[in-house]
């Protein structure tokens, strides 16, 4: 299932699928945790959409915490938007917030 809007980013709503995507080869997997009511999520969404199209070094997915509360709870999501970075099934780190410059700085630690 694709995320809201015209994005090519897949929305993950099942824990099984979440577990599958974070284990993808050695490329970086970025999971964006968001909700439709979250203003900051809407603020950064166009930037995230653009990033997913422009960077082939990463796999980018979204988890709508309104529908996939279990995944958000299991991942310890306590703020939106939150981005978690994975490689080979291991979480490398996370970023919370909608500041695009700070997000890119955090992302650059893993790409």
Q: Where is each model-derived feature located?
A:
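Intrinsic disorder
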Residues: 12, 24, 35, 54, ...
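Conserved beta-strand elements of beta-rich interaction domains across eukaryotes
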Residues: 35-36, 67, 88-90
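Non-globular targeting/processing and membrane-anchoring segments
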Residues: 1-6, 75-76, 88
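Non-catalytic, surface beta->alpha helical segment in thiol-disulfide oxidoreductase systems
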Residues: 78-79, 84-111
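Local sequence-structure signature of Cys/Sec-based thiol-disulfide redox active-site neighborhoods
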Residues: 19-50
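N-terminal leader/targeting and pre-domain segments
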Residues: 1-29, 105-111
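Thiol-based oxidoreductase modules, predominantly thioredoxin-like and allied folds used
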Residues: 12-14, 33, 45-70, 77
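Beta-strand cores of modular interaction/reader domains in eukaryotic scaffold and signaling proteins
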Residues: 11, 29-32, 59-62, 82-86, ...
